[in-house]
């Protein structure tokens, strides 16, 4: 569908019977209107040709072979000199056979039928709008209750008795005895509303704006009453308030989308194009058909039977008509969603029929497998691994994938630089993996983003753009902070990478889809690029440090008296004095030289404001030197003072892990400050 702003989009929702008729009907050149499927047949068993007005009719859905009608005549497609443009004998137009992929038909239902998605799925939209129990509506739809509110506005017999008479069940059997067949039909059509027709009449009488106003008034009244003290009654009030909120939201959605509630009851049933429910001939001359065809046949059989009961036979009992209407309703339910009402329908081999819902839903459905997850050109797939050295907006592509994705660009670069005379020579150089190929590939990748997608794509952050760089191996490297948007982790997840080709796609990838521009959740606005799983464990290990406190000097771990119940090996526990460092670079150098460990405690000289130090804090130890200087040792810092109590310097007790983490935070803050200063 293309809207007025020329945006191509796919919208799934309710449509009016007029819209279904407009989609399915067409006027052939002789003025005849075709589109209604009236026969439950597919192909003739002798001629092996589609039956007229059947599920594969060429008059309705188009020719099987382009330019060839059902009679076998041939016309050139698009030739204006060819006249006529359709076969006068069979009525088939001379058009392309691809029309059978999108040309729809329809079945005109003799009785209205409720759409099972909106009746049985939870929450039930029909039950919410009508504010009635679902079981009550099901009994009405499937003709278990035959008395409904009168559809006429005149004072009648049933209006005096009220609606939905359950107490006097004998009425269901006694009233037909007092009327002749014709009289009962008149009475039934006027005063008794049953089946989906009763639902449609009630939905048509709804005023959505009044529903919103009344629901809001009732919700406010329930809120003003307050708790009753009875737990059961309070729960009922809470459930009622939640129901009113859902009802108001549903009514607002119907108003906002210009959808009428009675459209949830079907009068015209669309028939899918034949190419979407094919019949295929396999080895041995056997035919393999889609289950949708059998379900359509069942609907047409039962609908035609109901038509015959109402038109050809006037002496048909009303109970038989109601029973046939129930069968039509059940057949349409099975077509739309098999098994939603309980036991699914099976074929002769005890295999469950695949309904329309089964075809489109799930991982192997039409949308996720054929449309969203289909194989496309200029794309690849591989396992993702962590790339801790990558920037947030970069990803690492394996050479094997990158050369395939950007092969056309590399070929163009080789020819432009006169390194290859034609495409064949350029491809041979790529196969030989010459060094110049990787240089050109690097140049191409610098100005071309790629899109990474992880299925299922449940929201817009499921596909983001990155600046690719070449990496060794056969896995895609990814920054761990972007994993939450993809709902991915590094336990074997796979991602697909795509190359945006058009200038519009590249501009969209750079301006809207880069990972560093999607830091907040589009749903709730919370930060989505936050550390998770491996990063949290790594930060904990980096900053945990040793469990020994400042008193480790006093309580030496190699002293066996401190561990009476444990066996201490002197080779494993060697007491070393905590070293002093003037700056963080010396500490990192000592770590790289393996003189200290990542979690080894050390003293680092630090420019710390003395006002941070609590004045009432008492040092744990004081070490005096021979010249009078002394060290005041606290839990987390050390102060060197002179004889005159002047502060020479301050050391903090930390680890190499703490230092590395602090430097990363400091560099990030400085980079953010510089970026803000550039913007201002």
Swiss-Prot record:
Residues reported in the UniProt entry to bind Mg(2+): 489, 491, 493
UniProt cofactor(s): Mg(2+); Zn(2+)
Described purpose of this protein according to its UniProt entry: DNA-dependent RNA polymerase catalyzes the transcription of DNA into RNA using the four ribonucleoside triphosphates as substrates.
Lineage: Eukaryota, Viridiplantae, Streptophyta, Embryophyta, Tracheophyta
One term of GO molecular function: DNA-directed RNA polymerase activity
One GO CC annotation: chloroplast
EC primary class: transferase
Protein name, per record: DNA-directed RNA polymerase subunit beta'
Subunit and partners: In plastids the minimal PEP RNA polymerase catalytic core is composed of four subunits: alpha, beta, beta', and beta''. When a (nuclear-encoded) sigma factor is associated with the core the holoenzyme is formed, which can initiate transcription.
Gene: rpoC1
Cofactor details (free text): Binds 1 Mg(2+) ion per subunit.
Organism of derivation: Crucihimalaya wallichii
């Amino acid at each position: 569908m293309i809207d007025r702003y020329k945006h191509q989009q796919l919208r799934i929702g309710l449509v009016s019977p007029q819209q279904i008729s407009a989609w399915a009907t067409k006027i052939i050149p002789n003025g005849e209107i075709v589109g209604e499927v009236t026969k439950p047949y597919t192909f003739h068993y002798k001629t092996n040709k589609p039956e007229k007005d059947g599920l594969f009719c060429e008059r309705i859905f188009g020719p099987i072979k382009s330019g060839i009608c059902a009679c076998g005549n041939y016309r050139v497609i698009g030739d204006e000199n060819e006249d006529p443009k359709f076969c006068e004998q069979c009525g088939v137009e001379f058009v392309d056979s691809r029309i059978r992929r999108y040309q729809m038909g329809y079945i005109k239902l003799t009785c209205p039928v409720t759409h099972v998605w909106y009746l049985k799925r939870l929450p039930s939209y029909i039950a919410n709008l009508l504010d009635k129990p679902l079981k009550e509506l099901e009994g009405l739809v499937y003709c278990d209750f035959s008395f409904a509110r009168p559809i006429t506005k005149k004072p009648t017999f049933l209006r005096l008795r009220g609606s939905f008479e359950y107490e006097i069940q004998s009425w269901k059997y006694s009233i037909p005895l007092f009327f002749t067949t014709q009289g009962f039909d008149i009475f039934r059509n006027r005063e008794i509303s049953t089946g989906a027709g009763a639902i449609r009449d009630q939905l048509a009488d709804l005023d959505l704006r009044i529903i919103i106003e009344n629901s809001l008034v009732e919700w406010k009244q329930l809120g003003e009453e307050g708790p009753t003290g009875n737990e059961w009654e309070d729960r009922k009030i809470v459930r009622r308030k939640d129901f009113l909120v859902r009802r108001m939201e549903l009514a607002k959605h119907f108003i906002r989308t210009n959808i009428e509630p009675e459209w949830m009851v079907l009068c015209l049933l669309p028939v899918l194009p034949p190419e979407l429910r094919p019949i295929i001939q396999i080895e041995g001359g056997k035919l393999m058909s889609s289950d949708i065809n059998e379900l359509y046949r069942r609907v047409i059989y039962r609908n035609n039977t109901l038509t015959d009961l109402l038109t050809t036979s006037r002496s048909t009992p009303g109970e038989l008509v109601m029973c046939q209407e129930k069968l039509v309703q059940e057949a349409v339910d099975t077509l739309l969603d098999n098994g939603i009402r309980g036991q699914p329908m099976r074929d002769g081999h005890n295999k469950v029929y695949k309904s329309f819902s089964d075809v489109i839903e799930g991982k192997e459905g039409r949308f996720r497998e054929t449309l969203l997850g289909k194989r496309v050109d200029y794309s690849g797939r591989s396992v993702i691994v962590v790339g801790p050295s990558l920037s947030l907006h970069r990803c690492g592509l394996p050479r094997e994938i990158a050369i395939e994705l950007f092969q056309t660009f590399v070929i163009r670069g080789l020819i432009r630089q006169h390194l290859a005379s034609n495409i064949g020579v350029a491809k041979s150089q790529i196969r030989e993996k010459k060094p110049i190929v990787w240089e050109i590939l690097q140049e191409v990748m610098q100005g071309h983003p790629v899109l990474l997608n992880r299925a299922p794509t449940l929201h817009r952050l499921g596909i983001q753009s990155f600046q690719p760089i070449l990496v060794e191996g056969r896995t895609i490297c990814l920054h761990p902070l972007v994993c939450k948007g993809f709902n991915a982790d590094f336990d074997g997840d796979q991602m697909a990478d795509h190359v945006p080709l058009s200038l519009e796609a590249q501009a969209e990838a750079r301006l809207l889809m880069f990972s560093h521009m999607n830091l907040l959740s589009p749903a709730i606005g919370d930060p989505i690029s936050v550390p998770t799983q491996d990063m949290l464990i790594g930060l904990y290990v980096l900053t945990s440090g040793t469990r020994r406190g400042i008193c480790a000097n006093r309580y030496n771990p190699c002293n066996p008296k401190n561990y009476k119940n444990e066996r201490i090996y002197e080779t494993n526990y060697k007491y070393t004095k905590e070293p002093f460092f003037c700056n963080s670079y010396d500490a990192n150098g000592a770590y790289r030289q393996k003189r200290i460990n990542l979690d080894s405690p050390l003293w680092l000289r630090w420019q710390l404001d003395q006002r941070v130090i609590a004045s009432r804090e008492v040092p744990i130890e004081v070490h005096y030197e021979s010249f009078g200087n002394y060290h005041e040792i606290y839990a987390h810092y050390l102060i060197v003072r002179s004889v005159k109590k002047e502060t020479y310097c301050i050391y903090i007790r930390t680890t190499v892990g703490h230092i590395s983490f602090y430097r990363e935070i400091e560099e990030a803050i400085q980079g953010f400050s510089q970026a803000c200063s550039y913007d201002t």
